[in-house]
Structure formats: C-alpha cells, structure tokens
C-alpha cells in the first residue's frame, strides 16, 4: 500500500499543535524534558505518512485491530440529544416524538450541521494519527519477534547446560544410593561376624541354687502374717433347714437401719432376705454354708404356700411356733 502526502492543512495543523505544546512546556524547565521527549517520539512527520504498508503488515493489522466507529464525532444531532436529555424532554417519550424534536432543533437552528470541508479536514487528522499509531505498533511487534527468535536460538545452549546439570544430579543420586547399599552390606557382615552365645555362658541359669532362692522369696511373701486370712473368719457352721443360728439373725439385724423393720422375726418378705444380692461374679464369692440355701427351698414342687405366706408367732412362754403343723416349735430360751 502506497503512502499518502501531507496536505497544507495538515502541515499547518501539526505546526500549530507543536507550538502549543512547546509554549506550555518550556525547555528551560528540567521537569519538562520527559514530556518533550515523548512529544518528539509521537509527533507526526511526513516520513511517517509516506511510509507504505506491506501485505504482511496489512494482514497483521487487520487481524490484530478491532474496528470501532464513533458515531458521535462531528454530529449535530448528538449535541441536540445531550441538550434535550439535560432538560428531561425525552422521559417516557416515543421514538417518533424524539425524531420530531431533532428535526425541530435543526430547523430552528438550535444546532447546526458541521460543514463538509471541516469534517474532511478532521478525518485527515484522524487518519494521520491512526497511521502513526499503527507504525508504532508494527515496530513494537517486530521487536518482540526478534527477541523471541534470539531466545529460541539461545535455548539449545541453555538446554544443553540444563541437561548437563540434570546428568550431574542423577550421578550424585546414584553415588549416594551405592554408598547406602555398601554401608548396609557392611552392617550385615558385622552382625554376622559377632560371636554367638555359647552354652558355657548360659551356665548357672535355672540351677538348683536359683530355684531354692526363688522358693524362699515366695515363702516369705506367702507366710506374711499381715496378709494372712484367719480361717475362723472364713469357716462357717452348717445351717439346718428348719432352724437358724442366732448369730446370723443378729448380724442380719445389725445391718438393718432403725427405719427398716426386722422382717425375719415377723416372717414377712422372707424370700427377699434369702435372695442373693451380690453383684459379683460366682468365682469371686466365698462358699459359706450359712449363706447357702437348701435345694428343697428352691424347688417349687416342695414349697408349702401356707408356710411361706403365714409367718411364725410367739406365745406367752417365749416359744416360736408356726401355724403349719409340720414345722417344729423353736425354744427361744434354749437358743439364747
């Protein structure tokens, strides 16, 4: 694509813009050096406009540029719309009413259309600025491509260096593994080379002298009087099925509190007294004849309902008798 020539209007326009910038930012001020340097880099020149585009550059620009159209530039109707919206004339109005208001604004010269010559000049300025911007973009893309090519060319050397480093690391790992295996083998050899324990070293263990000392130690702890249990406290006298010793009755009476009545003397709740109340395991209980029940009491076919329901009675002579004819009277004085 061939370049364009700069028109007189554009040359004058660029000269006026340069004067305005230099008048605002003096060269004598050191703080304005950066601004003036940027102005020189972005200023549009005749060489920029005369530079033609190649086919590759045009294709790249078309693929990487998003086209935008500004419909508000040099449009008198846009200016009329801003004025009407500021006054609130278009609130809840139809499109037909809005178009009639635009025509009325132009007819009454509220806004005037821009001249065609003015619009053409402004379009020329915008085209020059766009070409300057496209040239800057192409130069920037070209520099990036050059950097990428140089990086790809230097990448084989870097890859060789990286492979060399990886090889060195793998060699170090293999050497460490070999050293660990050798140390493990040496440890196993040392363990196998240790002298075994002979039968002569184990002599004296389990002899008669050791057994004699162990038996003496056990006898000392077993025959300790502090831990010994008196046989009299464990031994219990047998109980007759028809009679009971007063010692057991007294011990049962002592366990009862003042509020609890003597159920055994009055012959009530006899079954609850004879029922075992211990929650311990059978192996932990002591076999005491005084606390054991006769099998005849447990068997249901030999229990007399009258003897269980009716309790004993005491007469004036102090003799305990049962209403059941089969039971024998109990002499309280002889028991005491």
From Swiss-Prot:
Outcome of substituting residue 228 to V: In strain: Mexico 12
Positions of the UniProt region annotated as Required for binding to Su(var)205: 107-328
Outcome after substituting residue 173 to D: In strain: Mexico 2, Mexico 12, Mexico 23, Mexico 31, North Carolina 19, North Carolina 29, Zimbabwe 4, Zimbabwe 19, Zimbabwe 21, Zimbabwe 50, Zimbabwe 70, Zimbabwe 79
Subcellular location: Nucleus; Chromosome, Telomere
Position of sequence motif Su(var)205-binding Pro-containing repeat 2: 289-295
Motif stretch (Su(var)205-binding Pro-containing repeat 1): 225-231
Primary site of residence: nucleus
The protein's assembly and partners: Interacts (via C-terminus) with Su(var)205 dimer (via hinge and chromoshadow domain) and with moi to form the terminin, telomere-capping, complex. Interacts with HP6, which is also part of the terminin complex.
Protein name in UniProt: Telomere-binding protein cav
Organism: Drosophila simulans
């Amino acid at each position: 694509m061939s370049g364009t020539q700069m028109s007189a209007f554009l040359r004058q326009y660029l000269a006026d813009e340069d004067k305005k910038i230099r008048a605002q930012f003096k060269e004598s001020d050191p703080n304005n050096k950066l601004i003036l340097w940027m102005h020189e880099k972005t200023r549009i020149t005749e060489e920029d406009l005369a530079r033609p585009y190649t086919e590759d550059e045009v294709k790249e620009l078309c693929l990487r540029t998003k086209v935008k159209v500004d419909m508000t530039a040099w449009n008198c109707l846009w200016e009329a719309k801003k004025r009407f919206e500021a006054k609130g004339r278009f609130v809840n109005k139809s499109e037909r009413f809005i178009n009639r208001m635009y025509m009325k604004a132009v007819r009454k010269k509220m806004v005037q259309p821009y001249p065609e010559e003015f619009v053409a000049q402004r379009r020329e300025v915008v085209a020059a600025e766009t070409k300057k911007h496209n040239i800057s973009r192409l130069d920037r893309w070209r520099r990036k491509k050059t950097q990428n090519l140089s990086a790809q060319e230097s990448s084989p050397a870097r890859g060789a260096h990286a492979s060399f480093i990886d090889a060195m690391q793998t060699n170090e790992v293999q050497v460490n593994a070999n050293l660990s295996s050798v140390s493990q083998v040496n440890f196993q050899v040392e363990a196998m080379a240790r002298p075994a324990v002979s039968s002569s070293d184990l002599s004296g263990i389990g002899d008669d002298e050791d057994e004699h000392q162990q038996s003496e130690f056990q006898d000392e702890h077993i025959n300790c009087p502090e831990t010994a249990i008196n046989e009299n406290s464990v031994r219990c006298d047998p109980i007759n099925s028809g009679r009971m010793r007063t010692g057991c009755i007294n011990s049962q009476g002592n366990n009862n509190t003042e509020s609890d009545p003597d159920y055994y003397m009055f012959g009530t709740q006899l079954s609850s007294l004879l029922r075992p109340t211990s929650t311990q395991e059978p192996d932990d209980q002591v076999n005491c004849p005084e606390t054991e029940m006769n099998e005849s009491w447990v068997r249901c076919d030999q229990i007399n309902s009258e003897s269980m329901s009716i309790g004993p009675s005491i007469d004036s002579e102090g003799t305990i008798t049962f209403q059941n004819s089969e039971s024998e009277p109990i002499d309280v004085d002889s028991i005491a």
